[in-house]
UniProtKB/Swiss-Prot annotation:
Organism expressing this protein natively: Natronomonas pharaonis (strain ATCC 35678 / DSM 2160 / CIP 103997 / JCM 8858 / NBRC 14720 / NCIMB 2260 / Gabara) (Halobacterium pharaonis)
Lineage, uppermost ranks: Archaea, Methanobacteriati, Methanobacteriota, Stenosarchaea group, Halobacteria
Disulfide pairings: none
Lyase as UniProt keyword: yes
Active site: 129
Positions bound to substrate: 78-80, 114-115
Pfam families per record: MoaC (PF01967)
Name of this protein: Probable cyclic pyranopterin monophosphate synthase
GO molecular function annotation: cyclic pyranopterin monophosphate synthase activity
Enzyme Commission code: 4.6.1.17
Subunit structure: Homohexamer; trimer of dimers.
Associated pathway: Cofactor biosynthesis; molybdopterin biosynthesis
UniProtKB keywords: Lyase, Molybdenum cofactor biosynthesis
Length: 160
């Protein structure tokens, strides 16, 4: 952190506060986040062929990701409720992973990167929930399963 940066969600006394964005002009904003869940190759193959007992994993995860984007303000304490104008979700698979990319757009006074991150993490949690029976080992643990590399990969702000 640079010397001139300050924590915007904390008062001088150290109390939590929501940032006042009331005076900021509306701008067009877009944020893209990504992450991946590592799985056993047999689980990824079952997802790709829609052969998972609970149903279409990626369809359910897509709905979960979109719902999470729309409800970020309810789960991240200092997030503003923003008007979401668009959500795009994209899944890709490799032999041992499912990657989810979520792009969020809004027009308003504050960005939407937290919404994109919330969409990714919830979407990947839904994947885990849908395949957990296949991922458990004999002891009920998940030695091959993990959510990793969650990050914001793009952020845009354009004047209207």
């Amino acid at each position: 952190m640079s010397d001139d940066s300050e924590l915007t969600h904390v008062t001088d006394d150290g109390d939590a506060q929501m940032v006042d964005v009331g005076e900021k002009p509306d701008t067009a904003r877009r944020a893209v986040a990504r992450g991946e869940i590592t799985l056993q190759p047999s689980t990824v193959a079952a997802i790709e062929t829609n052969d998972v007992e609970k149903g279409d994993v990626l369809a359910v995860a897509r709905v979960g990701a979109i719902q999470a984007v729309k409800h970020t303000w309810e789960t991240v304490p200092m997030c503003h409720q923003i008007p979401i104008t668009n959500v795009d979700t994209e899944f890709s698979t490799s032999e041992t992973a499912v990657e989810l990319t979520v792009a969020v757009e809004t027009t308003g006074k504050t960005g939407c990167e937290m919404e994109a991150l919330e969409g990714v993490t919830t979407g990947l949690n839904v994947v885990w929930d849908m395949v957990k029976a296949a991922e458990k080992d004999a002891d009920g643990q998940y030695p091959d399963t993990g959510i990793d590399s969650v990050e914001v990969i793009e952020k845009e702000k354009r004047a209207l």
